[in-house]
Regions:
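Glycosyltransferase-associated regions of secretory-pathway enzymes
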Residues: 1-65, 81-166
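Small-residue hinge/turn detector
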Residues: 66-78
Length: 166
């Protein structure tokens, strides 16, 4: 069962979109809410993330979020949603009865890619663990040096491949 915890993460120099983030708290008053940033990651992972090396080498902020999101969900479980997403209504409780859930990215822009920016999972979820392990296999920063975007290496492309593989 997926716990009623909403996770949102913001890293980088820009200010978080607090108005958008508030829509999640407003529509889910009975859920625990955890806002994550560089400091809270260090607080909850005092020995660093399992993929700390990949996190530190990732040049894109959204890629850093993807790397951290899997490890946060592995440890706490819950629902991870991008900080720039709007909640229009509460999530349905039946979603929480699964090991994990997500949705597709915009079908017109990215076809059949599974969105990791809207992803719920129970603690110790096998799919989350596969994402963490796949990221750990990325050697150095060779993938990002070639200009390959994070959404192709640690984001939706990786998630989609692993969902279909497992």
């Amino acid at each position: 069962m997926i716990p009623k915890i909403i996770h949102q993460l913001w890293v980088g120099p820009k200010k978080p979109p607090h108005d958008l983030m508030k829509t999640w708290r407003d529509n889910h008053p009975d859920w625990e809410y955890m806002f994550w940033n560089e400091e809270s990651i260090k607080e909850h992972f005092p020995n660093g993330l399992y993929n700390q090396k990949q996190y530190d080498e990732m040049p894109e902020w959204n890629g850093k979020c993807d790397i951290a999101r899997y490890e946060i969900l592995d440890k706490f479980g819950g629902f991870f949603v991008d900080a720039d997403a709007v909640s229009l209504r509460p999530l349905d409780d039946y979603l929480l009865e699964n090991d994990s859930f997500s949705c597709y990215e915009n079908e017109f822009l990215r076809g059949q890619l599974i969105a990791c920016g809207y992803f719920g999972a129970q603690r110790d979820c096998e799919l989350v663990r596969h994402n963490i392990d796949a990221i750990h296999e990325l050697s150095g920063n060779t993938l990002w040096e070639g200009g390959v975007s994070a959404w192709k290496t640690v984001g939706p492309v990786l998630m989609s491949r692993l969902v279909h593989q497992y």
